[in-house]
Structure formats: structure tokens, C-alpha cells
């Protein structure tokens, strides 16, 4: 039987293990002085896959920008990967972003660099020093997304789906506990979008990150399991499963 001190340590460890990877409590999402969303409450735990829906201009992307500290927190409380967004200093924001895998709709690859050099650029920017280890890690994540034979291609030589796979590989470089994906299939045709979603689901099943995916594509959350949040009327609410399968 554990003594009292050991029991307290066990409870503390359990609390740490169970701490949400993404949490927003009573947050007002602001863009300059404009109130976008009010009283936002979101909790995402390790291993959860959560969709964030809403019309254009409803505030979905502003939530992502708040979570990566691009938009400052002005009201409420928020933590991401153990970083307190209320207290975070500008000098600490790069360390926060190393814990986040961010995937955008438009890929945002460096068009004048090869696939491998795109990844090496990120590794160097996030503190990696040894080139051999950097190349090995780049090859590892490219293999994870099925792009290991494309390392020396230039982005313009790749299809849209292939560019998005590289963007996902880039997001995985530092083993992030949280993945934030902003319309990652928005520029892709239906078949390519399905391939990318299957890749996301494979990564999620294997590594169990917390995933928040912004999308307007209702077919995604019908075909692939996950919680569903919706931005509407200046707030965020959770959709019941039986409702969103009927939409």
C-alpha cells in the first residue's frame, strides 16, 4: 500500500497526465479591437480529434491564431501544450510553436527550396544543430507521409496533394503533442482530400496527438470520427453526434 506522500505523488502524476493539451475558458477572441467570438470554452485532451466548423468569417481561423499566439489573449484563460497564453512572453512564443504542428490550406512551402531543404529549414529554426540528425529526421517524417522518394523535388514539381503531404511532414518534425489544421483539404479535389484525411487518421491513431481541424466540409466529419464544434452567432458550441450525422 502506498503511504500518504506516495499517494499524493500518484494523484499529482495522474492530474498531469490528464491535463488537457488545449483548453480555452471564457476566452474572448479578438482581432485588434474587434470582438470575433465571446466566452469561448474548448477542451481537447490527448488523443482527441476535434473538428471546428463554421461559415466564412465566423472566427474559426481566429481561434487557431489565438492558440499559436499570433492573436494575443485579452480575456479569459487558455493553455496549449502546458503554455499559459495569458502569461506567455514574446520570447517564449517560438518554444510554444515547437510543440504545435500547424498545417494550413495553402501549404506555405518555400518554393525556392527542395522538399528536404524545406524541412531542414524548420529543424534549424527550431534548434536542431547536427546536420546528420536533421537529415535523418527529415527522411523519417517524409517516409511517414509517403514522400520519401520526393526529397529532392522542388515544390512546383509536386501535385497539390503531395505538397500538402510535405506540409504535414513539416508539422510532424518535432513530435508535436498538438496538431492544428486550418482547412488542410480546402484546395484539394475530393479524392486527394480523402487521401489526406486518411493520412491524418493514420497519424492520429499511431501517435495520439490532440488534433483541432478547421473545415467547412461536412463530408469529412461524417466519414471520419471526431468531436464537432461549431462557430456561430459569435460563440462556439459542441454539436451532438446524432445531429451532425443528420445534417
Regions found by a protein language model. Give the residues of each.
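Conserved ABC ATPase signature
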Residues: 154-164
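Helix-to-loop junction immediately C-terminal to a conserved catalytic motif
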Residues: 68
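Catalytic Walker B motif of ABC-type/P-loop ATPase nucleotide-binding domains
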Residues: 179-182
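ABC ATPase NBD coupling module
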Residues: 85-101
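A short, proline-enriched helix->beta-strand linker immediately N-terminal to the Walker B motif
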Residues: 173-177
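Short coil-to-helix segment of the ABC ATPase nucleotide-binding domain corresponding to the Q-loop/switch region
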Residues: 112-121
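Conserved ABC transporter NBD signature motif
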Residues: 76-84
Amino acid at each position: 500500500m502506498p503511504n500518504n506522500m506516495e499517494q499524493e505523488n500518484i494523484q499529482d502524476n495522474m492530474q498531469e497526465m490528464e491535463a488537457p493539451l488545449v483548453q480555452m475558458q471564457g476566452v474572448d477572441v479578438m482581432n485588434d479591437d474587434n470582438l470575433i467570438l465571446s466566452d469561448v470554452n474548448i477542451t481537447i485532451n490527448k488523443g482527441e480529434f476535434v473538428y471546428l466548423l463554421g461559415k466564412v468569417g465566423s472566427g474559426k481561423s481566429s481561434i487557431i491564431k489565438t492558440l499559436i499566439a499570433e492573436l494575443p489573449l485579452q480575456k479569459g484563460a487558455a493553455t496549449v501544450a502546458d503554455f499559459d497564453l495569458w502569461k506567455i512572453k514574446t520570447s517564449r512564443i517560438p518554444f510554444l510553436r515547437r510543440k504545435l504542428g500547424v498545417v494550413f490550406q495553402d501549404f506555405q512551402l518555400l518554393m525556392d527550396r527542395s522538399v528536404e531543404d524545406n524541412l531542414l529549414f524548420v529543424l534549424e529554426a527550431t534548434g536542431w544543430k547536427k546536420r546528420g540528425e536533421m537529415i535523418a529526421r527529415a527522411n523519417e517524417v517524409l517516409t511517414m507521409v509517403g514522400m520519401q522518394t520526393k526529397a529532392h523535388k522542388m515544390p512546383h514539381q509536386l501535385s497539390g496533394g503531395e505538397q500538402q503531404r510535405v506540409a504535414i511532414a513539416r508539422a510532424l518534425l518535432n513530435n508535436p503533442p498538438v496538431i492544428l489544421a486550418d482547412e488542410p483539404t480546402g484546395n484539394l479535389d475530393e479524392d486527394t482530400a480523402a487521401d489526406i484525411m486518411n493520412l491524418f487518421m493514420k497519424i492520429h491513431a499511431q501517435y495520439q496527438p490532440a488534433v483541432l481541424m478547421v473545415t467547412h466540409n461536412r463530408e469529412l466529419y461524417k466519414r471520419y470520427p471526431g468531436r464537432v464544434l461549431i462557430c456561430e452567432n459569435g460563440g462556439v458550441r459542441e454539436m451532438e453526434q446524432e445531429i451532425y450525422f443528420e445534417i
